[in-house]
C-alpha cells in the first residue's frame, strides 16, 4: 500500500528536542523519514492501523513522547479515541498494568492538547 503523506511534516506539533535534532542532523532525519515511509508502504496495512500498532510498540517501550506522537498521528489518520484506547489496553497482559495506565494517561494528555489546539473529535 502506498505511503500516505506524513502529518508529522507539520513541525508545529513536534517536540522541540526533535526539531533541534532535525536541525542539527538533517541527513539522519531525512533517512529516518524515508525508512518510516518505506515501512508503511511495504505491506497491506493502512496508515491508521500502522499508527495504532506504533502506539502499542511505543507504549511497550515506555516512550511517552513517541506514544503521544502516534496517538496524534492515529487521530489524524481517522482513528477514534476508543480505538486508540483499545490499542493501549491490548498491551495490559503483555507490558503490565502500570505501563498501560501510564500510556492511557499519555493518550489523554494528547487528546486534551488536540482539543485545546482546536483539533476536534478527541475523547
Residue ranges of model-derived segments:
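Acidic, glycine/proline-rich low-complexity segments that act as flexible tails and inter-domain linkers
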Residues: 1-49, 103-123
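Short alpha-helical linear motifs
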Residues: 72-79, 95, 106-115
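Residues at alpha-helix boundaries and short interhelical turns
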Residues: 22, 43, 60-64, 78, ...
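Aromatic- and histidine-enriched alpha-helix N-cap/loop-to-helix transition segments
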Residues: 47-48, 82, 95
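A general alpha-helix detector
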Residues: 17, 34-35, 52, 69-73, ...
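Short alpha-helical scaffolding segments that buttress acidic/His motifs in well-ordered protein cores
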Residues: 32, 52-59, 87-94
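C-terminal structural segments of small proteins and small subunits
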Residues: 85-110
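Mid-chain, well-packed structural core segment of small domains
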Residues: 60-89
